[in-house]
Amino acid sequence: GQGEYTFPNGLKYVGEFKDGKEHGQGILTSPDGNKYEGEFKDDKRHGQGTFTFSGGNEYEGEFKDGKEHGQGIFTSPNGDKYEGEYKDGERNGQGTYTFGKGEWEGDKYVGEYKDGEEHGQGTYTWSNGEKYKGEWKDGKEHGQGTYTYPDGRKYVGEWKDGKRHGKGTY
């Protein structure tokens, strides 16, 4: 049925219940301003929903067992946007991250993620036109890759921890 419950810690749930648990459509708000609106299963965020953080960040997409899991879109007030796959609350699988205002404004990464970091095959394009296409490990260029400059010059070779390393050609 429908109901409303306020927890001793200040969390407030308004929505559907089943067997005394949050289950179905509902809204969960916290005293610090976080808000989740969407599907619940057995007292956990599960299915489609939107989580809005008190600082303005927002995740809209799939949840499983209380965590971001499946396809989702993350946005922040400065314009950062990630659209892609999540697993156990982290960016995992294929995704696109576009940077908003700040140090990396206009930069974009398209590729694979593991545990929230760029990992696997991916392409990073800087706002000045420079581009790296190749292998990534733990958020850094690592393995075989091609770095292209705006004027067309290229470096093709090996990378380690974000730096040119080993054999390569210009």
Residue ranges and their predicted role:
Residues Y5-T6, L28-T29, F51-T52, F74-T75, ...:
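Hydrophobic face of amphipathic alpha-helices that form TPR/SEL1-like repeat modules
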Residues P8, K18, K41, T52-S54, ...:
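Compositionally biased, low-structure terminal segments
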Residues K12-H23, K35-H46, E58-H69, K81-N92, ...:
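Conserved anchor residues at repeat-unit boundaries in beta-strand-based tandem repeats, strongest
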